[in-house]
């Protein structure tokens, strides 16, 4: 008898006020205790109780001020990134109260040196017993660059070229200690075998790193590499490096195409597609009936101010949308940008979300509900489980990112109402079968790569 294939589940939320649902902080049931370690520890314990594979935290390195070139909207209305705690520090807080749950943090490969990144994640992996993932990003805009003393953000494809070399350097550092390099022979006075600890001497186009790292090899070999870039260059990067991919897609058809496209990139890079797990994001809103759940969804979306969505959209597209009146049709804005030969991702967003006929205010409200691409599903626990299974069996993903409607209650509801249904139907684990994140995801331990002495 063939064993039922099981899905993976991941939590995803900002260490701050807003993730995808921009009105979440205003929800009557939301806790705005996001500056407290106990807040994150509660969420981590909840997801571990639900046997989730992992949770991971996004990050941005600047307050959103692209809309209006000021802080009035991004900060005043509580936009995405108004508050953003440093993710690796939050992961350490959550690792202390969990034993199995995988924990991921986002750190930019553009604005931090590889030695620092390698050391941070090697340390977290040691302290957590091999449960850590690095979500690799290349950052987004000039506002982030200026916070690191750089006037202009590196061009998109060049950022990925640099990130390729960055990953090479980080992995060399993670491999600079052999498995048995640490001896700890008290009687003989031998702490470690220096012949098994190696300089990396990386000298490339972008980076120079001597090594070795000061942290021995991870309990899971290396931290898991997670990546979320879905541009053509980002997909090639994922094909080369990613062991888990975070995808945003508005419907089953796009999810399927994204899934197949990324798996093809992994195969083209000479890697095993089964060793890269693809997650797609969904936002469940639960209720004791379909009608109640739909009412709760409508309430959640009513909390979104149009301009707070436009603040995030301005940051994502690089266009100051405050330059246009709120009643301007999107098609007129697109025509104006095209006439002025202004390159922007706004055309792609508008086409993908069928927003060309909306006004700017309507698009802002829509974007603020789910950043345009995260499906919002309203239903009972049984109905949400049905949708997850339908998409899983339909080839949408290997697993799902559960984006919270509000925190921390959305995760409590999901674990109590959806997870048991998935478990009863054989689509999700009832117990953890291993200790490391690689165990949970079914990923092989990377072979130790040799280093020069």
Curated annotation (Swiss-Prot):
GO terms, biological process: dibenzothiophene catabolic process
Pathway note: Sulfur metabolism; dibenzothiophene degradation
Superkingdom in the source lineage: Bacteria
Conditions for induction: Repressed by HBP or sulfate. Part of the dszA-dszB-dszC operon. This protein is expressed at high levels (at protein level).
NCBIfam families recorded: FMN_nitrolo
Enzyme's top EC category: oxidoreductase
InterPro entries cross-referenced by the UniProt entry: Diverse_substr_monoxygenases, Luciferase-like_dom, Luciferase-like_sf, NTA_MOA
Note: Reduced flavin is provided by flavin reductase DszD.
Name of this protein: Dibenzothiophene-sulfone monooxygenase
SUPFAM superfamilies: Bacterial luciferase-like
GO cellular component: cytoplasm
Organism of origin: Rhodococcus erythropolis
Keywords for this protein: Cytoplasm, Flavoprotein, FMN, Monooxygenase, Nucleotide-binding, Oxidoreductase
């Amino acid at each position: 008898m063939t064993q039922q294939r099981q899905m993976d589940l991941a939590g995803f939320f900002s260490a701050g006020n807003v993730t995808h649902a921009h009105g979440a902080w205003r929800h009557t049931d939301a806790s705005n205790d996001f500056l407290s370690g106990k807040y994150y520890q509660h969420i981590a314990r909840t997801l571990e109780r639900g046997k989730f594979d992992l949770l991971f935290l996004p990050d941005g390195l600047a307050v959103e001020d692209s809309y209006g070139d000021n802080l009035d909207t991004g900060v005043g209305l509580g936009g995405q990134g108004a508050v953003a705690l440093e993710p690796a520090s939050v992961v350490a807080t959550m690792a202390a109260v969990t034993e199995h749950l995988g924990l991921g943090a986002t750190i930019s490969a553009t604005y931090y040196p590889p030695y620092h990144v390698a050391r941070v994640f090697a340390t977290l992996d040691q302290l957590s017993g091999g449960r850590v993932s690095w979500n690799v990003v290349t950052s987004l805009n000039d506002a982030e660059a200026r916070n690191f003393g750089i006037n202009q953000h590196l061009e998109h494809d060049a950022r990925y070229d640099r990130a390729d070399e960055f990953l090479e350097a980080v992995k060399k550092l993670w491999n600079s200690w052999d498995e048995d390099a640490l001896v700890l022979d008290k009687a003989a006075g031998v702490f470690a075998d220096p012949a098994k600890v190696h300089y990396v001497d990386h000298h490339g186009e972008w980076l120079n790193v001597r090594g070795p790292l000061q942290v021995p090899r991870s309990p899971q070999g290396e931290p898991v590499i997670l990546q979320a870039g879905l541009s053509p260059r980002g997909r090639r990067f994922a094909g080369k490096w990613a062991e888990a991919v975070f995808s945003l897609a508005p419907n089953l058809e796009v999810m399927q195409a994204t899934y197949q496209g990324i798996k093809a990139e992994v195969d083209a890079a000479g890697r095993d597609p089964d060793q890269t797990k693809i997650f797609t994001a969904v936002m469940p809103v639960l209720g004791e009936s379909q009608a109640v759940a739909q009412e709760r969804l409508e309430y959640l979306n009513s909390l979104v101010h149009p301009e707070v969505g436009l603040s995030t959209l301005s940051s994502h597209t690089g266009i100051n949308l405050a330059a246009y009146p709120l009643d301007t049709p999107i098609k007129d804005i697109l025509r104006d940008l095209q006439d002025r030969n202004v390159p922007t991702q706004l055309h792609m967003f508008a086409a993908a979300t069928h927003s060309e006929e909306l006004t700017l205010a309507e698009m802002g409200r829509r974007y603020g509900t789910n950043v345009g691409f995260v499906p919002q599903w309203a239903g009972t626990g049984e109905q949400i489980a049905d949708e997850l299974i339908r998409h899983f069996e339909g080839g949408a993903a290997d697993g799902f990112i559960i984006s919270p409607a509000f925190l921390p209650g959305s995760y409590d509801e999901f674990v109590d109402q959806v997870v048991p249904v998935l478990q009863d139907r054989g689509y999700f684990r009832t117990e953890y079968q291993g200790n490391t994140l690689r165990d949970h995801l079914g990923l092989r331990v990377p072979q130790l790569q040799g280093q020069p002495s």
